[in-house]
Amino acid sequence: MAKRGKSVVRTLEDLTLDSGYGGAADSFRSSSLSLCCSEAHISYAHGGHCWNLTDSMRSRHNSLDTVNTVLAEDGETLECSGHCAKLPELEDVPWSLGEVENALNKEEELRFGTVSADLLARLSALVCRALVRIAREAQRLSLRYGKCTKYEVQSAIKMILSWTISVNCIAASLSALSMYNMSTEDKFSRGKSERCGLVFSVGKFFRWMVDSRVAVRVHEHAAIYLTGCMESLFREVFTRVLNSSVVEKDNGIPKFTLESFEQALSNDSELYGLLLPYQHLTCGKNANGILSLPDSLSLHRNQQCSSKAGDAYSQSEQRTIEQSLLATRVGSIAELSDLVSRAMHYLQPLSIKNHSNGTPLPQKSSLVHWEPEALYTLCYFMHCPQMEWENPNVEPSKVTLQNERPFLVLPPLMEWIRVALAHAEHRRSFSVDSDDVRQAARLLLPGVDCEPRQLKTDDCFCVSRKLDAASTEAKFLQDLGFRMLNCGRTDLVNQAINLLGPGGINSMSEQGMTPLMYACVRGDEAMVQMLLDAGADINSEVPNTVQKFPSVFPETRQATPLTFAVLHQHIPVVQLLLDAGANVEGSLQDGMENYTETPLQLASAAGNFELVSLLLERGADPMIGTMYRNGISTAPHGDMNSYSLAAAHGHRNVFCKLLSQSEKGKADVLSLQEILAEGSDLEERNSLKMEATRTGKAKLKALREAMYHSSEHGYVDITLDIRSLGVPWTLHTWLESLRTCFLQHRRPLIQGLLKEFSSIEEEEYTEELITHGLPLMFQILRASKNEVISQQLAVIFTQCYGPYPIPKLTEIKRKQTSRLDPHFLNNKEMSDVTFLVEGKPFYAHKVLLFTASNRFKLLLANRPAAENTCIEISHVKYNVFQLVMQYLYCGGTDALHIRNTEVMDLLSASKFFQLEALQRHCEIICAKNINTETCVEIYNHAKFLEAPELSAYIEGYFLKNMAVLIELEPFKQLLYNTPVENCCPDVLHDLEKTLATRIRSIHLSSSKGSIV
């Protein structure tokens, strides 16, 4: 026992605890201390090394030997997860199983065959849980600034997904967003998903985020990020299962079953906990409780990829670092400090390598460190009292008042660090504080909760050790001044101003925010008034200079106090600021480009009718959009104006308010123009007219953008409101609106939309009409028995088919074969074969029939060598068979006289005897005889005979004359008869294929109609 005590004392003497994360970062290279508890190092599927929980790990040795210990008491609580709170189950998800299958097939290595519907449904249900987790974290992060941007989604991805998977998903999201920003040509005529290169619908995800109240304001980039992430996550999960040794292979092709799928996920430590139904996130271990490192943290893998010899670790160092990352319990704060030190020394370079939060990297001297309070908070959650019992100076307690958390719910240290770092990076802070650890505990442990982090002055307060004493003192005094103002006591304003430094009342915090901005965030009306009276700049802006203010949140750059008051919807404060002379457009100056959202844009996105009305009364312009900082924008006023934001979020009342205000302003301007024009000359009148024209074009473009977003997100009522103003349809907005109405079973709106199709210019026809439009319209025709809708769809199909003639059937030029003089036709003389047709003999010659077709050759083969072999033909009429023989003996169709009553039978006979040229000749005759009365009968016969060319011709006739045919009962029966497998044809499906081919030839080809 004494020997063990000396070991612990010696170990603790080697540990240092400072304001960072321990001093061992400088000396651990020389450390020979091994934290390994087991010699069992095995390779693991989707991680580095995993640690088996062997009996040796249950031993009560010193605390460093029990970092990963499974205590005996844990066996009683292994089933505790059954009592844990569960995630909410989603009734609707923003994807379909068809989209999931297409997303998987997007990668060639995943195209190995058809995935069963049950497997797709199970995969969808599991990944749905990851969506809920990410959305819940993004929802909490969005409370700070009252909106969900790509940064909130990105940080949520980092918190929920493992190191390796999050990097891949963020890369996919960034790629989708880059493609979207670059696809500015004809952007209102193409879907957001197409512009992003995604299979999943960005519009569905946006609508889902709004309906789920992820935030009162959702930026379209956030929806793109989440869509790209989830699509990538589906492929990531499927790839890992595909590469799992659990999946059996049949001739090299993976053979999936639900059992093998579940087993593969259970063995993957990066996916198992993520896809569990519980609210807390089980990380770093698989279903058997085996801990393992993810791919990106595997020292063996990274060392093999490292090109620098100096970066190599010895075997003992590798085991020490791995054990530090996988630690689940600690016995003291000193031990934890050392473990965090080792882990951070290894993780920090990887964090920089995969840095992707959108801000410039800090200098190496400003790497993220752990504040002492953060370490103490983490120690509280990781502390194991039993590990102190080995200390001879500590007597174990005789009475236990608390139950320990079982091992199965304790995350390894690397997961604590991952989540805490994600929170710190989201704040743009250079230090992890205690609240970051509490937020991590809320996520990683069952039954732990805490409030979301609020926007405070000390969020990013950090004093570098490289600052001299005077600078450090000034920084602390400034922080004290902000705290005094933040407490809400107006009597401390003057004293606080004296502490803020040279900037006085307009001094800025690390986040680039002034005391007035913080007061607006809190909605402290009295403090706002006091600060204004003290001389605070009412139009101060959050700076753009990242070098001086590295903790500025990107989405708040150039924000003013009015912006923050609107963000948090404090209407009395907004009223106060406007009365005091605040710029109603925020930081926007006349004639300047706007790189941040105006207060009216923010109010419109939130749907706050009262706030929108107030800003409009004060002269806010709803036409102003936002220019992206990369300079990409097709609109002179920027993108996503107030109209678009209200429409995108489905705030119909706000949208109507914006419209009514602009119409009122337009009337006032016109009356003023008329007054001025009374005494002006012609040149001045023309100038006013041109100005009005420019304004009208700008508004039309703004409303087109709003129409695009409302249709993408499924707010069809707003789309129709915009259409009623005279804004023209694009094919895309029309199709999206039609799809929404069909899904919502809104028959009157469907009828109205179908009637509007004729207003779409043919130049608008794109590939989307074929890939999305035709399947949708034929689905509506199949599902709806409404005569009005059927008639309208028939008119649309006829319009799409075009005025050009149906492609003609052409004769097949028969190759020159053996022929006999017609004199020998049915001539008994010299005949060597006799056919018995309807009981009558028909004489023929083998020399001719052997070369006529394979069918005749087969009939004549293996017959006795008798001179006049008799072959019975039972299903062909005598006169029809005579026409067939006449065709063969004459060598063509010129001498044939075919009656209309015989052509169908002759077509069947020519098909049976495999005489293609004669068959085509009969098909041409049938095509000439087609009319509204005979078309259905001929079509059914052609389908029965499997004559594709004639069937396609008749389908063209159907489409060209569908407006008339849809009224006829035989045609209705043909369309709506339920197809039986391998029996009746699916006519609607065939019509869709024929129409798609036609549209490609006359609308999408370069010749535009010459190919028919």
From Swiss-Prot:
PROSITE patterns listed in its UniProt record: ANK_REP_REGION, ANK_REPEAT, BTB
Main subcellular location of this protein, as a coarse class: membrane
Residue ranges of ANK repeats: 511-540, 557-586, 595-624
One Gene Ontology cellular component: membrane
Membrane topology category: Single-pass membrane protein
Signal peptide (from-to): none
Domain BTB: 831-897
InterPro entries: Ankyrin-BTB/POZ_domain, Ankyrin_rpt, Ankyrin_rpt-contain_sf, BTB/POZ_dom, Histone-fold, SKP1/BTB/POZ_sf
MF terms in GO: protein heterodimerization activity
Keywords: ANK repeat, Membrane, Repeat, Transmembrane, Transmembrane helix
Transmembrane segment boundaries: 160-180
A Pfam family this chain is assigned to: Ank_2
CDD domains: HFD_ABTB2-like (cd22913)
Superkingdom of the organism of origin: Eukaryota
Keyword Isomerase: no
Subcellular location(s) of the protein: Membrane
Protein name, per record: Ankyrin repeat- and BTB/POZ domain-containing protein 3-B
Source organism of the structure: Danio rerio (Zebrafish)
